Each structure stands twice: as structure tokens, then as C-alpha cells.
Amino acid sequence: ATGARELVTPCAGCYKTFQKIYPEIGDLGLEVYHSIHYLEKLINDGRIKFKGDLGKKVTYHDPCDLGRAFKMFDEPRNILKQIPGLEYVEMARNGLKARCCGGGGGVLANNPEMAVEMAAERVRDALAVGAEIIASGCAACKDNLKKGAKAIPKQERGKIKIQDITEIVAGNLE
């Protein structure tokens, strides 16, 4: 044993496993955080300070494993809204009604073409509100949204970026 008291994971699927499945087997003896919760804790404790010079519009894609499983909707948006120089824009389909990107649930493994089409539709949702950055809290979503963006003609997708929320926070630390 490492003696660790906390475990932080940036993976939505791993977080779901540590929070919902492993406790059925036994007590981990750890406080488990998704990176979004941990970042929020650090911000609220004053341990993270932001600079802000991006001047970009950002939106948040709700990963199925965080949104539907844990109702984690406000926390990531609150983090993004605290970064100076970022303008938060909300996609029409968000929260429980957010469109799945196709990166999880076996879609990508069983029907990769459909998964990319689903991701492209989600990227179009972000483009429709003028977003220049799509943030997410799930590596599978990030990777599949990137594939979806590449499937959209360059003149339509522009220079939209797909980033994990931890990357956005790290890039804007004081």
C-alpha cells in the first residue's frame, strides 16, 4: 500500500468504477475524486489562481459517465467561468439532454463509423454557438470529439480545439 488517502482520476469511466463498482467489493480506504471535483476544491481553497488572456469562447461537453451517472453538470462550468479571458457559451443540448459523443458505451468499439458521426454532430452543436474550444472531463470523449472534428470539412470546423478541462486549467495558471 502506498499510504495514499486520496485518488484523483481525470477519466470519467474510471471515476464511475471507483465510485460505484469497487465499493461493492470492499472499502478502498481512499477519498476518490474526479479531477473536476479536485480542481474545484483547489480553486475554492484558493490554491489555484488564474491568469486570463485567451480571449476564446469555450463550451463544455457533458460526458455520459459524469453527467448521467453523477449529475456532474455545474462543477465543470463553474471552473471554466472562473478563468478570465474565457467566455462560456452553452450548447443547446446540455446536462441530461446532452448528445452522446459516441466515444463510450461500446459504440466506438462496435461501430466506429457511427461513433465518428455522433462526435461530428456534437462538434457541430458547439460550432452552432460559436465555441472555439470544446472542453470535456473524459479522455474517451476528447479523443472521439477530435475524430468527429476531423470528419467535418475544414472550412466548416475552422480551428476548433478539443481539450480536457485539466488542460485548459493548466494552460491558464497564474
Language-model regions, residue ranges each:
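Iron-sulfur cluster-binding electron-transfer modules in prokaryotic oxidoreductases
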Residues: 1-174
